[in-house]
C-alpha cells in the first residue's frame, strides 16, 4: 500500500512537470517570434492626409494589413514625423526577391509600409492640387534604418544597393545622420537615413526591395516601439571632450575621469547641478546623480522649458523674374525648402504696392521661446539663395514688416538698426507704408544673411518674448575688471563701450547718411524700446591659454557655438600683454546666454 501511494505521488509530480514544461515551450515559442520593424518618415504637411479624418485612413490600413502602426508626434525643429510599422513573424521566408509581386508581401508590416507610402503620395498630390502647384513626376521616400541593417542593405562593395538601383531604376542613397538637417532630428544615434527617389513605380519597387532586405536581416539595435523612447531626441550639442563625463555617466561611452570639474572648483554659480534623471534617454542608469551643467546646454522644449508657442508670419518680396527658381519644377524647390526649414511657405502671386514686378512669399512658423533653432530664420535664409542670382556678388532682400512691430528692428533713436548695420556691414533701408513697412537689405551675401538673421530674430523675440519680464529686466552692471574665472564664481563680462555712445554717433534720426523724408522712418515714430532685450551685446574675456580650445580645429568649435546658440560671435585681436582675447556676443538674451555658457564650458575644460 505504501509503495502504491509513492508511485501515484511520483506520477502526479511527473504530470505537473510535463504541464509546466509545455507552458515553457509554448512561451519560448512566442518569444522566438521575430519582430519586423519599419520606420518611414512623413513630411508634416502631408501627415494629416495619411492619418485621415478621425484616423480613418490609418485605421483602414491597420485593419486591412493586421500590422501595428504608430504615428509619433512631431519633434521641435523637425520637418518630418516618424511612422513606425511592425509585426511578429513566426517563420521568415528563406528566399526573397528584389521585385514586388502583386499581392505577395513578405509580411503584414511590409504590406502596411507600402500602403502608408501610397497614402503619403496621395496626400502630397492632393496638397499640390489645392495650392495650384505643378505636379512633380518624381517622388521621394525616406526610411530610418539602423547601422546593422544598413550594412546588409549596402552589401559587400555596394553589391546589394547597386542591384536595387539597376533593377528598379530608382535612386537609393544611405545617408548618415546629420544633426544640422531638420529632417534628421527624429533619427536615433544608431540610425542612417535611406533616401529613395525617382518615378513613382520605381520608388515603390525600390521600397519593396529595401524592406525585403530589412525583413530578412534582424537589427542588432534595440528599436523602441513606445512613444516615450521615440520622443527623446539625440543630443545635438557638441561639448568639449574634457567635460563629457560631467554630462554623461560612465556607462562605457566616456570612461575617462574628469579632474577639472570637481566640487570646490571655480565654477560659476549659475551652473545649476542636475541629476541624470532629468535627461532620461541619454543614460542607461540614473541611480547615482552626477553634476550636469544645465546652463551649458541650450534649453529645449520638453526638458522643463516653456511650452508656450506662437505663430510667426514673415512676408518676403521676390522679383517675378526669379519666382520660378523659388518654386522649382513641379514645386520641387519650394517643397524642399518647406521640408528643410519646417515652415509653411506660400507664394502669393498677386501684385504688391511696391511694384508690378514683385510678388509676396509668406513664411509661417509655429515656434516656442525655447526652440534651439528658428524655423523662420532657416526658411528666410533658404529663400535668399533662390531669390537672388547664384553668381551675384551683391544681393538684395526685401521684407514687409507690420508698422506695429517695426520698432523692435529700429530701436530707440535708430540704435538697433544702426548697430545691425555696423556689425554686418549691410545696407539697410526702411521705407514707411500704410500697413506694412518695407525693409530692404543689400550688400555682400554674407553681410545680407547676417543682417537677415538679426532682423528676423528681433521680430521673433518681439512675438515670443515675455514683455512683462523683458520690460523690467535690468542690464548687467558695467565693470572695468574683466578677469575670467580668476578664483571668483562670477563671469567677468562688461557692456561694450559702443552702447553708451551709440545715439550720439548715429545722427539725429538714427540713420546716418540716410535722409529722413516722408517715406523713410526716423526717430519720431512711436516705437517702444522697452519690448527689446535690455542688453543687445555682451563681452567675454577669453584667456590666452583657452583660445585654441574655444576656436577648435579650423574654427570648428566656434562655428558650432554660433550654430547652436544662434548668436553672432566676434573674436577681437589681443589687447592685453597676456594675449587674452575679447569675444563679443550679440543677439537676443537667450542666444547670448546660451553662447556665453558654451564658451565658458570650453574655457573651463582647459
From Swiss-Prot:
Keywords: Nucleus, Repeat, RNA-binding. Residues 35-99, 138-210, 311-380, 394-455, 535-599 form the KH domain. One of its GO terms (molecular function) is RNA binding. The lineage of its organism: Eukaryota, Viridiplantae, Streptophyta, Embryophyta, Tracheophyta. SUPFAM superfamilies: Eukaryotic type KH-domain (KH-domain type I). The keyword Nucleus applies. Residues 1-26 are annotated as: Disordered. It is found in: Nucleus. GO terms for cellular component: nucleus. Pfam families: KH_1. This is KH domain-containing protein At4g18375. Residues 1-10 have a biased composition (Basic residues).
Amino acid at each position: 500500500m505504501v509503495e502504491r501511494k509513492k508511485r501515484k505521488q511520483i506520477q502526479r509530480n511527473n504530470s505537473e512537470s510535463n504541464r509546466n514544461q509545455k507552458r515553457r515551450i509554448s512561451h519560448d515559442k512566442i518569444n522566438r517570434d521575430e519582430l519586423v520593424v519599419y520606420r518611414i518618415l512623413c513630411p508634416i504637411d502631408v501627415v494629416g492626409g495619411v492619418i485621415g479624418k478621425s484616423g480613418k485612413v490609418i485605421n483602414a490600413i491597420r485593419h486591412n494589413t493586421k500590422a501595428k502602426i504608430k504615428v509619433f508626434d512631431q519633434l521641435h525643429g523637425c520637418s518630418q514625423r516618424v511612422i513606425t510599422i511592425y509585426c511578429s513573424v513566426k517563420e521568415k521566408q528563406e528566399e526573397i526577391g528584389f521585385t514586388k509581386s502583386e499581392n505577395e508581401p513578405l509580411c503584414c508590416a511590409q504590406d502596411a509600409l507600402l500602403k502608408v507610402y501610397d497614402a503619403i503620395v496621395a496626400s502630397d498630390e492632393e496638397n499640390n492640387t489645392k495650392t495650384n502647384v505643378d505636379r512633380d513626376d518624381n517622388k521621394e521616400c525616406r526610411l530610418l534604418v539602423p547601422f546593422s541593417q544598413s550594412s546588409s542593405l549596402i552589401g559587400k562593395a555596394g553589391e546589394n544597393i547597386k542591384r536595387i538601383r539597376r533593377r528598379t531604376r530608382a535612386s537609393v542613397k544611405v545617408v548618415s545622420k546629420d544633426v544640422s538637417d531638420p529632417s534628421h532630428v527624429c533619427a536615433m544615434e544608431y540610425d542612417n537615413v535611406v533616401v529613395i527617389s525617382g518615378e513613382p513605380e520605381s520608388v515603390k519597387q525600390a521600397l519593396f526591395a529595401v524592406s525585403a532586405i530589412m525583413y530578412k536581416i534582424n537589427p542588432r539595435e534595440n528599436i523602441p516601439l513606445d512613444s516615450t523612447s521615440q520622443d527623446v531626441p539625440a543630443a545635438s550639442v557638441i561639448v568639449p571632450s574634457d567635460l563629457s563625463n560631467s554630462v554623461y555617466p560612465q556607462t562605457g561611452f566616456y570612461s575617462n575621469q574628469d579632474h577639472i570639474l570637481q566640487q570646490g572648483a571655480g565654477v560659476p554659480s549659475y551652473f545649476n547641478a542636475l541629476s541624470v534623471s532629468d535627461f532620461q534617454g541619454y543614460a542607461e542608469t540614473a541611480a547615482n546623480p552626477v553634476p550636469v551643467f544645465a546652463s551649458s546646454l541650450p534649453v529645449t522644449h520638453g526638458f522643463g522649458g516653456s511650452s508656450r508657442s506662437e505663430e510667426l508670419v514673415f512676408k518676403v518680396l521676390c522679383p517675378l523674374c526669379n519666382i520660378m527658381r523659388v518654386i522649382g519644377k513641379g514645386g520641387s524647390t519650394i517643397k524642399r525648402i518647406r521640408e528643410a526649414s519646417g515652415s509653411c511657405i506660400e507664394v502669393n502671386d498677386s501684385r504688391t504696392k511696391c511694384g508690378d514686378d514683385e510678388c509676396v512669399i509668406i513664411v509661417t512658423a509655429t515656434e516656442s521661446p525655447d526652440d534651439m533653432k528658428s524655423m523662420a530664420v532657416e526658411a528666410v535664409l533658404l529663400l535668399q539663395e533662390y531669390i537672388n542670382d547664384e553668381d551675384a556678388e551683391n544681393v538684395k532682400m526685401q521684407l514687409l514688416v507690420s508698422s506695429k512691430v517695426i520698432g523692435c528692428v529700429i530701436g530707440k533713436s535708430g540704435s538697433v538698426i544702426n548697430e545691425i548695420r555696423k556689425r554686418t556691414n549691410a545696407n539697410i533701408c526702411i521705407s514707411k507704408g500704410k500697413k506694412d513697412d518695407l525693409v530692404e537689405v543689400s550688400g555682400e551675401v554674407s553681410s545680407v544673411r547676417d543682417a537677415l538673421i538679426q532682423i528676423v530674430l528681433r521680430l521673433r523675440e518681439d512675438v515670443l518674448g515675455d514683455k512683462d519680464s523683458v520690460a523690467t529686466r535690468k542690464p548687467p552692471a558695467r565693470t572695468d575688471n574683466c578677469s575670467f574665472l580668476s578664483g571668483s564664481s562670477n563671469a567677468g563680462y562688461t557692456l561694450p563701450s559702443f552702447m553708451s555712445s551709440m545715439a550720439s554717433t548715429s545722427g539725429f534720426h538714427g540713420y546716418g547718411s540716410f535722409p529722413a523724408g516722408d517715406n523713410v522712418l526716423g526717430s519720431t515714430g512711436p516705437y517702444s524700446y522697452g519690448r527689446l532685450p535690455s542688453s543687445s551685446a555682451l563681452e567675454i574675456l577669453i584667456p590666452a591659454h583657452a583660445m585654441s580650445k574655444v576656436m577648435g580645429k579650423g574654427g570648428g568649435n566656434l562655428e558650432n557655438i554660433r550654430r547652436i546658440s544662434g548668436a553672432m560671435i566676434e573674436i577681437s585681436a589681443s589687447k592685453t600683454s597676456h594675449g587674452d582675447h575679447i569675444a563679443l556676443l550679440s543677439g537676443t538674451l537667450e542666444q547670448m546666454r546660451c553662447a556665453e555658457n558654451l564658451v565658458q564650458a570650453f574655457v573651463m575644460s582647459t
